[in-house]
Curated annotation (Swiss-Prot):
InterPro entries documented for this protein: P-loop_NTPase, Thymidylate_kin-like_dom, Thymidylate_kin_CS, Thymidylate_kinase
UniProt entry tagged with the keyword ATP-binding: yes
GO CC terms of this entry: cytosol
UniProt protein name: Thymidylate kinase
EC class of the enzyme, as a word: transferase
Role according to the record: Phosphorylation of dTMP to form dTDP in both de novo and salvage pathways of dTTP synthesis.
One GO MF term: ATP binding
Gene: tmk
Family of this protein: Belongs to the thymidylate kinase family.
One BP term from GO: dUDP biosynthetic process
The keyword Magnesium is annotated on this UniProt entry: no
Residues involved in ATP binding: G9, L10, E11, G12, A13, G14, K15, S16
CDD domains: TMPK
Keywords, alphabetical: ATP-binding, Kinase, Nucleotide biosynthesis, Nucleotide-binding, Transferase
Amino acid sequence: MSKFIVIEGLEGAGKSTAIKNVLATLAKHGITSPVTTREPGGTPLAEKMRELVKQGHPDEPLTDMAELLLLYAARAQLVGNVIKPALAKGEWVVGDRHDLSSQAYQGGGRGFDRDLMMTMRNTVLGDFKPDLTIYMDIDPKLGLQRASARGELDRIEQMKLDFFERSRERYLEFANSDESIITIDAGQDLETVTQSIITALEAWLVNNGY
């Protein structure tokens, strides 16, 4: 039976490395070549929306509401045209971000009303949600240091520290109240983080009969 696994976290949390570990662990269990996605993005139209969200436009500021709507428009394209069809064919899907990012960044960071965020989620996704979310938790200050070391920061990465502190609070709020979310301490050394991800995913796979 197909499953949808998502990796979440703030900037610099190590999501890319986590995804590699997830893919390697799945392969050991005979789950090879899962569909991989990223949000925003993952389809031709959604990638154009990603560019707007990440880079903005030099002649016009992107409003917070426009950003929110672009993110959900991109998500609707990805879920409808890629994720759901793949799952229907029995394929596994591994995603770099999903709706929890919007709940954290737009709901927590931007401060959008909780009811609005739930309405957006329910309208676009209904009862569709990941089977497992691996949340890479990191102190925002350390995460931004790591992100800065990678090179030029995009529009979101340039937000001030308090934005990411609010986003982290919302991430943790969801993680602490949803059994389908596993929290990994991403502030540890790489070897420890890697082993934590593998151990958690192995346990989840065994519990689900894989």
